[in-house]
Each structure stands twice: as C-alpha cells, then as structure tokens.
C-alpha cells in the first residue's frame, strides 16, 4: 500500500496519452534497447539507484550511490538499502546480504553514454537508438533526462538516442484495457508467451520427458541464482523483459534480436506509431516540473489529510495532482474565492472531468474552510482502531525478545550516519550509531550494578552491619566526655 501512495505522488499524467504527430520519428535503421531504472522513490526529486539497458548482443548495468536513502517502498521493491559503516555509505543487497559495488551518478551516466556510443559505432549504418520501457505512468524517461540535465549531458545523449517508446501502449493497443488490468511486466510476458510455449511443448513432448530428470537436479543447485536472475525488482531483469515483450507484441516467435531485414522492418513499423522524440520528452519534463511547483503550493490545505489514514492521504494526493494539472495554484484559487467566494470555486472546478461530483463538493468545502478565517479548516473524520497498534507492539516485542542479540549486533554495525534507520522504529530503546552519543552505563535503565565491597569499615561486608548491631545491644559504649587538648609548655633550662 505504501508503494501505491508513493507512486501516485508523482505529478505526471498518464503515460503517452497523445502522440505529437509533428515530431514523428523518421524512418530509418535504429537499434532497439530495453531500459529500466531503480530509484529511491517515485518522485522527480528522487535519484537513480540502478541503471540498466539490454540488447541481445550486449547489456549495461550499473549501481549508483544516491545522496538520499531509499524510502520503505523502494527498499521492499528493489531489495536494496543504504548502510553506513563509520563515515562510509554503501549499498547492500537484502537478498544476498552482500555489499554492492556502486559509482557516483555522474560516473555511471558517463559510462552509460560511452556504452550507447559504442553500440552505434559497431553499426555504422544505423540512424540512432530507440529506447524501450514499460510503464503505465510515464516515469523512466523523466528520471533519465533529469539526471542527464544536472550534468549538462542531454545534448550528447540526444545525438545517440532519438526516441523513447512505451511498450505498455503497444500492449494496450493489441490486448485491450481489460487484459492489462493489474498486469505486471512479468505477467504480461508470460501471457504473450503462453500460446507459443503450449505449441512448442506439444511438438517436443517426448524430448521434454527425457530431459526432466537431469533438469530437476540442476534446479535444486541453481535455485538461488535463478531466483536472483528472475527477480523483477531489479532493473537489469526488467530491461531484458521489456525487450522480450516488444518482440512478442510484434508476433515474433523469437526472443532474440531478429536477423533478417524483413523482421527488422516489421519490428520498427510496430514501434514507430508509439515513438516520441527526445525533444518532446524534454518539453514534457519541463511541464512536469512546473506542475510540481503548483502541487507543492497546496500542501498547507491538505496537511490534515496527510496526518490521518491511508485513504485520506491517497485522496489528498489525487486532489493535488488534479488541481496542478489543470493549472491552478493556491494563490489563483484564493483570488477566485476573494472575488466570488464559494460560488467562484464551484464554477472553477466544474470543468474538471476527472473528479466525481462528491469529490468536487468535498474539495470546494475544504478550500472554502481554508480561505475563510471565520471557519475552522475541515479535518477528515476517521475511526481509530485500538487493536491495531497493540498487536503491533506485542509482535515487535516478541520478535525483539527472540532475536535481540542478532538485531542489536546487526543494527549497530550497519545503521549509522545517513543509513536507513526505519527498521529500528519498532525497538524500545534507540540503537546507538555514529551520529548519536551512547549513554553511560550508570544511566541505563537495566539491572542495577552491584556495589563494590569496602573492607576498611565494618559496613563493607554483608555481615558487618549485623555484628555491629549485636555489640551495641549487648554492651553499649559509655558516653565519652570531650578531652581537652593540652598545649605544650616550654621548660626553661636551669644551671
């Protein structure tokens, strides 16, 4: 559920809803490359963690060390997290528990551009590269272009890469919306390959029976490697799957690069209607940055929504996106309300078709209560569940009691300056790291320390006080009068 919220937070419209016919990709000989990225989140301000590209003859994969940490949804999706050992930050795989070799963002982008130029150099007759990606909401081209824009590498990128193509629109045109509902990239690949696999299995059924015995033994040995190789959360795996889906959508039985010129022409003809030039994507990126500024202006209005339940947070995100895409800002709506009050807000929102009638009513009431100083800002009503937090505390307590030694050892070494610390939220006591000062032993709330024995007085040992009490009871000491201190007198010498 967290992943859905963070995905909706991206202020981008549905992917490739319209194709600009003025900037159409010209006919030519192009190299198709599947591309995908792993990011720290689903916002334009997030960073790339892994950049991957695939062709049947060569592929590119590089992990990037981000400045920010991965959010919980990204960590769960990509199985990667940021750890800190001392003053060094690094990436660690949550599957293999090994440190991942990474580079800086600018170094990884330079290697990526060199790899693309090498592909073009190997085929002098080519006209450029067409990148394939698969997403329902357009995000990958924006992230790649935003990263290149920071270092002034867009012109060099545009000389090699000519267009981006979303294979989701290709699948939508061939299969329809009903078949693509809740259909991920792997499920789509299996759906397209199902008919071809069934026909191939019927023809080669005797051979498959003889090979089952030897293949089963290898599957047990290479089980972990296969799970890692087919992990859909990795950009390297998804880039390969994107390329294979594009071939399957063109009714090609092959899962590798077509060799004949006729097959290349058929593949390009299938891709061309959905291709958009890089220049148009750059203009869209600029528009999305402007929408982000409009969306951020509505944060004070929906502050109470983000402090409540998941339902209201998703609803607030939807309202902010719709208002920003329609060109509204908080200042413009305030000017409308100042002039015509609530009726002006209703007229301004009537032309928005993406909102239902009850949603428009709720939004108008919320804006009116925010702008009117005599009214209190509307707070969404919800029923808190008293059993939920209690069960979580018990579950966390049981887990911490069983795995206390292991968790304390791992967190103390892997969570530090700038590392991911969200896993320590369920612990009762904070885990010390390089950014926090560890408390002294005398101030801890654990078992009290035993005092040292003092052998100089009678109260040092455990039996000392008892002996003193018996002596005082048997024969109490008589009171002593103060003794006068005599002063020394000088003696005179006589003859």
UniProtKB/Swiss-Prot annotation:
Keywords: Developmental protein, RNA-binding. Transmembrane segments: none annotated. InterPro entries: Exu (IPR037998), Exu_RNase_H-like (IPR054362), SAM_Exu (IPR040941). It comes from the Eukaryota. Residues 197-217, 377-495 are annotated as: Disordered. GO terms for molecular function: protein homodimerization activity; RNA binding. GO terms for biological process: bicoid mRNA localization. The keyword Hydrolase does not apply. Residues 207-216, 398-414 have a biased composition (Polar residues). The keyword RNA-binding applies. Ensures the proper localization of the mRNA of the bicoid gene to the anterior regions of the oocyte thus playing a fundamental role in the establishment of the polarity of the oocyte. May bind the bcd mRNA. This is Maternal protein exuperantia-1. It comes from Drosophila pseudoobscura pseudoobscura. The lineage of its organism: Eukaryota, Metazoa, Ecdysozoa, Arthropoda, Hexapoda.
């Amino acid at each position: 559920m967290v992943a859905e919220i963070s995905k909706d937070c991206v202020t981008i419209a549905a992917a490739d809803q319209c194709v600009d016919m003025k900037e159409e990709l010209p006919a030519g000989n192009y190299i198709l490359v599947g591309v995908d990225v792993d990011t720290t989140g689903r916002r334009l301000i997030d960073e790339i963690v892994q950049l991957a590209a695939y062709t049947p003859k060569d592929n590119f994969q590089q992990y990037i060390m981000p400045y920010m940490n991965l959010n919980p949804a990204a960590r769960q999706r990509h199985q990667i997290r940021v750890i800190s050992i001392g003053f060094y930050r690094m990436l660690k795989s949550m599957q293999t528990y090994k440190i991942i070799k990474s580079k800086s963002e600018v170094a990884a982008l330079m290697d990526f551009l060199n790899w693309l130029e090498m592909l073009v150099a190997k085929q002098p007759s080519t006209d450029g590269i067409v990148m394939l990606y698969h997403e329902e909401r357009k995000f990958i081209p924006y992230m790649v272009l935003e990263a290149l824009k920071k270092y002034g590498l867009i012109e060099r990128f545009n000389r090699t890469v000519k267009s981006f193509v979303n294979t989701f629109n290709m699948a939508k045109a061939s299969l329809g919306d009903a078949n693509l509902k809740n259909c991920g990239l792997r499920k789509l690949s299996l759906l397209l390959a199902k008919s071809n696999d069934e026909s191939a299995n019927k023809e080669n059924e005797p051979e498959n029976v003889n090979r089952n015995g030897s293949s089963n033994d290898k599957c047990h040995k290479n089980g972990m490697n296969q799970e890692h190789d087919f992990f859909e959360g990795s950009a390297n795996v998804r880039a390969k799957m994107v390329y294979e889906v594009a071939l399957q959508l063109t009714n090609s039985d092959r899962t590798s690069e077509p060799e004949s010129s006729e097959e290349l022409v058929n593949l390009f003809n299938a891709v061309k209607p959905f291709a958009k030039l890089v220049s148009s994507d750059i203009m869209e990126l600029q528009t999305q940055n402007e929408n982000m500024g409009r969306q951020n202006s509505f944060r004070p209005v929906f502050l109470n929504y983000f402090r409540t339940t998941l339902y209201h947070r998703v609803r607030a995100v939807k309202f902010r996106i719709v208002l920003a895409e329609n060109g509204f800002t908080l200042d413009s709506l305030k000017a409308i309300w100042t002039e015509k009050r609530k009726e002006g807000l209703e007229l301004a929102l009537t032309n928005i078709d993406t909102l239902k009638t009850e949603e428009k009513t709720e939004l108008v009431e919320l804006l009116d209560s925010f702008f009117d100083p005599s009214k209190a800002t509307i707070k969404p009503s919800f029923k808190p569940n008293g059993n939920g937090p209690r069960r979580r505390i018990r579950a966390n307590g049981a887990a911490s009691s069983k795995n206390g030694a292991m968790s304390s050892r791992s967190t103390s070494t892997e969570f530090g300056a700038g590392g991911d610390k969200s896993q320590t939220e369920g612990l009762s006591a904070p885990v010390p790291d390089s950014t926090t000062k560890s408390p002294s032993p005398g101030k801890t709330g654990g078992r009290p320390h035993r005092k040292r024995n003092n052998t100089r007085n009678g109260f040092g040992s455990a039996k000392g006080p008892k002996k003193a009490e018996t002596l005082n009871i048997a024969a109490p000491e008589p009171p002593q009068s103060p003794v006068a201190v005599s002063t020394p007198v000088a003696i005179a010498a006589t003859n």
